[in-house]
Structure formats: C-alpha cells, structure tokens
Amino acid sequence: MNQLLTAEALRLLDEVGEIDSKADVLSIITKLRKAGHPALLVTEVITQARLRTRAKAKFGDFASSMLFTEAGLEQATRLQVAAVHAERLKLGGYKKIADLGCGIGADSLAFASLGLEVTAVEQDPQTAALASFNLAPFPNAEVQVSDAEQFDLTSFDAV
C-alpha cells in the first residue's frame, strides 16, 4: 500500500478501471509491466482495482473514486445503511460527529455528505490514510490517527 497514494498509482488505477475476470488481471499486468511500471506498483493497482469492483455492491458508483483495504471493505457499512444513520443524526440536531474506529470512512462519508462536521478517528495509519483519501472531497471532514479509547470527545454532539 506504500505506493498506492502516489499520483502515478492513482492515474493507473483510473486507467485500469473495473476488473471482472482473471483474464483481465493477466492482461492488465502484462500491459503495465511492458510499459515499465514496477511490479509492486502494478500489484497494488491491480489489488485496488479488484477491491473497487467488489465494492460496487456496497458503495455503487462511489466505489470507483474510493480506496479500500480487504478488511476495510468487508467491515464497511453499506452506503444505504450509513445514509440512514447520518439522516437520523441530522434530524436529531447533531452537528459535530466523532466516528471512532472509522476504518475506510464509510459512515463518515455519509455524515459529511449531509453537511455534518465529522472527525474520523482511526488507529491504523495506513487505514487512516485511505479514509483521508475517501473523505478528501469534504471540507467538513477530517481524519485523525488516534486510539479511540484515548480520544477526547468533549467537543462532539454524537459518537
């Protein structure tokens, strides 16, 4: 995952698009390696493209602009469910939300898209980096690398 957040990797990931079969994987690996891209970069791009393809079931078209880990995708709240949670918080008058153990930021995306101020907290730095990428379009969302049990919640309306 070290090279995934580079401009080159993100460009290649967009070029690769969806991967639907093992034949696609082989074809894309061959093409990228012939173009001179390092094996590690190609592996990370292929892995991410496959995760994006699988993520469409949870995130619809949003998956094509997100980054995932295997565990993060498996544990992420489905977009429709996160949207219901976010709507309930908004209707309840809550404005400042702490999303503890945010993972890749699925719930935080829903909160932020409704205009709620979100601080997403994730202990794992690599997962937090992906959450930051996924939340980048929202100026009302931030990600902090921290232990959720130690995080100060005094300034938040809801957790």
State the predicted function of each range.
Residues 1-159:
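SAM-dependent transferase fold signal centered on methyltransferase-like domains
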